[in-house]
Amino acid sequence: MKLNVSNELKSRLTHAAENGSVIAKDILSEVKKNVPVEEVIRGSYNFFSTKRKRTEAGTFKKIRIVFTACNKDLGHPNFPDRNNPQAPWFPENRTDLEPSTFIELFKNLGPYQPDEINYFCSAISLDSKVTIRLHDSMNDFMEAYLESNYSPISDGSESSLHNSCMRYEDKARNAADFYANFAGAKILVARDDSSNVVGRAIVWNEITLWKSINTPIAASLLDRIYSSHAFVVELIRKQAQEA
């Protein structure tokens, strides 16, 4: 029997890999091998999927992804619905797996560092490609700051973006006016496929730092990074370094 993965899990893995998760990229490579499941997975697990654990957090929902799989002996003569191809997907035939356990089931992968696992857990919770662009107009600042434009979900209840004190219209307008019209700053804005804001950061270009009294250094500075998902912070930093 070949490794069987649901369309939702494939989608989440694909987007997580596009968003920089090394683990998601590695798992996708294993999934695409099209080999018997026992060559890839430890134990008797197969028919992998995901489910979302939702927690209300005020104006947004915290989403935590739990992996699910079937580990029943589908060929056993006493297995209910033995000849039903949908049987592996019935809730009573499935078990929940934490992300770390799911990763460890892959024979040919790992070990991974804790920060790689944390990145994977965060990235897998957003089923979307993240796009980051640099803007400089007052309207761009306003859109990035207004709470109504934020993603409705986060990977944690303490989302720095959703808890920003500048998310209200009056404060957002004042901040946008200051940064765009007086300070001359720019803003990196991260959005999902639905154009929801999932992160932002102020960019100060061509500032002068002093290495010593007589040694000025021209530099750019990334400031005030806010995100709905932890991995987005790393994407913003990477984008800033490459810009």
Question: What annotation goes with each model-predicted range?
Answer:
Residues 1-243:
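Non-catalytic substrate-recognition and accessory regions of acyl/acetyltransferase enzymes
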